[in-house]
From Swiss-Prot:
It comes from Homo sapiens. Residues 202-223, 320-353 have a biased composition (Gly residues). The modification N6,N6-dimethyllysine is found at residue 104. This is Heterogeneous nuclear ribonucleoproteins A2/B1. The modification Asymmetric dimethylarginine is found at residues 203, 213, 266. Keywords: Acetylation, Cytoplasm, Disease variant, Host-virus interaction, Isopeptide bond, Methylation, mRNA processing, mRNA splicing, mRNA transport, Nucleus, Phosphoprotein, Repeat, Ribonucleoprotein, RNA-binding, Secreted, Spliceosome, Transport, Ubl conjugation. The modification Phosphoserine is found at residues 29, 85, 149, 189, 201, 212, 225, 231, 236, 259, 324, 341, 344. There is a cross-link at residues 22, 104, 112, 120, 137, 152, 168, 173, 186 (Glycyl lysine isopeptide (Lys-Gly) (interchain with G-Cter in SUMO2)). GO terms for molecular function: DNA polymerase binding; G-rich strand telomeric DNA binding; identical protein binding; miRNA binding; molecular condensate scaffold activity; mRNA 3'-UTR binding; N6-methyladenosine-containing RNA reader activity; RNA binding.
Amino acid sequence: MEKTLETVPLERKKREKEQFRKLFIGGLSFETTEESLRNYYEQWGKLTDCVVMRDPASKRSRGFGFVTFSSMAEVDAAMAARPHSIDGRVVEPKRAVAREESGKPGAHVTVKKLFVGGIKEDTEEHHLRDYFEEYGKIDTIEIITDRQSGKKRGFGFVTFDDHDPVDKIVLQKYHTINGHNAEVRKALSRQEMQEVQSSRSGRGGNFGFGDSRGGGGNFGPGPGSNFRGGSDGYGSGRGFGDGYNGYGGGPGGGNFGGSPGYGGGRGGYGGGGPGYGNQGGGYGGGYDNYGGGNYGSGNYNDFGNYNQQPSNYGPMKSGNFGGSRNMGGPYGGGNYGPGGSGGSGGYGGRSRY
C-alpha cells in the first residue's frame, strides 16, 4: 500500500504511542529467553511484544531485550516495582528511546536532572512543581536568573529522586507549563559531558553501567566489560562502546553512526571546544557551573535567548548526530552497531530483530 500524506502522520502517531509502552531491559542472563522474560513482566500487565536480542549468526543472546506493554500505566507500574530480577540476575529496565532520538547525544545517559527551557517571567517555581510532581518525587527546582538584574533567563532545572521521571518526561517531548510551551531535555553536568567526550578515544571511566575492563555491568555478552563490548558486545562487532561506552563505536571512534566522536566534530559530544556544542559560550552561564556548549548563543527553538556567559551544565542538545541513517525494523538496525547504519551489528542489524 502506497503511503499518503494522511497515513504518514497516523503511522507516526501509532509508533509514538507504542514507544511510550516499551521498555528496554539490559543486563539479561544469557539463559533468559523470550518466554522467561515475558513471564516475568506479565505480572504488571499484558505484553504486546517481547524479544531477546540475539546475534543473527550465532543466535546467542546479546544480553538485552525489549518488552512492550498494552498501556503506559502498566509501564509505570513495572518501573515503580524496581529492582527487577530475572533468572537470578538483577536487570536494568529503562524506557526505550525512540529510533529517531537514539542518535542524539545523551539519549541513553541516565540522569535525574531535567533541563526546562521556555520559562517566561510569569512562571514561578510552584508552576514547575505543580506540573512535574505528577511524574515523580522532586528533590529540587531551580529557575535561573540574572545575577545583576534578577530577571529570569528563560530556563531552569528540576531534579528528581530517580532517573525514570526524566526519561518519561523527555520521551513525551511536548509540555505546556503555565500556558507556555516548554522545552525539556536531559541535563548533563560538565563531568558527564567530558565522560562522553572521552568515550570516542576509549579512555577510562565508567558511565554507570560497569567498571573499566572485565567486570561490572552486563549489557552485552562480550568479554570486555560487557556493556561496552569486547569482541561480541552490545552492538556486535566492537561492542556497545569499544573500551568505554561510545554507544556502538568502532575502535576508539566512529561512535553514534560512524562520525568521529559522539556526533561529529573533534570534541566528541558535539564536537569542537569544551562543553556540549561546537563553540564556547554557555547556556545561561555563570550560575554554579550551569551551561556549557553553545547554548544561548542565539534563540533556543523560539523560546528566547539564554545569554552567552561560559558555564558547565546544560541540556542534551537536539539535532541529528551520527549521520541520521534510519534504522530498519522496530528494533533499529543502524546507529547502535559499528559505523552506523544497517550493519550486522546494530540494534538488530538488517533483520527485524
